[in-house]
């Protein structure tokens, strides 16, 4: 059963900037309420790790996570890296001038779509740490590929700006069903409002009924 639970974090429906997940662990900021732990455990069905990156709660922006590993930006602190490594995942710092790395990488467990903005040396780290084939491309000509889509092992939901050609390419890259959708009443930057794994999705609480139905169809 694929559950979808609407939540707010720090008073905003942009929950994806604060939370990152795979199928084993979900990373949340230290000072979110306990009810978010409950939502994670009941919906995503993972353990919970309360971490920061550069002492910031923006885990969804500053990390890229799949079942194989975790990528962190250069501004992460050494003691924070140690905490991530203690979970037994592959962990490395991606050497790039960009800090909001999740905007530039759309990562599954076998393939990652990477923005052409990301330096070639950084792309190799993506491949090694996440254990994926790296494909460099845009979505609708936009290099912020990680912000415009979310995926799990069943489906990929992408912003409505994506063309038919984009949908076809994404389906070929990731070998899952692909369709367009929005979150939080029409927002195209899906990563900002959706945290998804194979078990379920947490979404911003402004998400409308038709948006929830589309998520269930594509990701469930």
From Swiss-Prot:
An example of a GO molecular function for this protein is: translation initiation factor activity
Q: What is this protein called?
A: Translation initiation factor 6
Q: Does the keyword Protein biosynthesis apply?
A: yes
- List the source organism: Pyrobaculum aerophilum (strain ATCC 51768 / DSM 7523 / JCM 9630 / CIP 104966 / NBRC 100827 / IM2)
One Pfam family here: eIF-6
Question: From which lineage does this chain's organism come?
Answer: Archaea, Thermoproteota, Thermoprotei, Thermoproteales, Thermoproteaceae
Q: Which GO terms describe its biological process?
A: assembly of large subunit precursor of preribosome; cytosolic ribosome assembly; maturation of 5.8S rRNA; maturation of LSU-rRNA
Described function: Binds to the 50S ribosomal subunit and prevents its association with the 30S ribosomal subunit to form the 70S initiation complex.
Keywords linked to the UniProt accession:
Initiation factor, Protein biosynthesis
Q: Which GO terms describe its cellular component?
A: cytosol
Membership in a protein family: Belongs to the eIF-6 family.
| Disulfide linkage | none
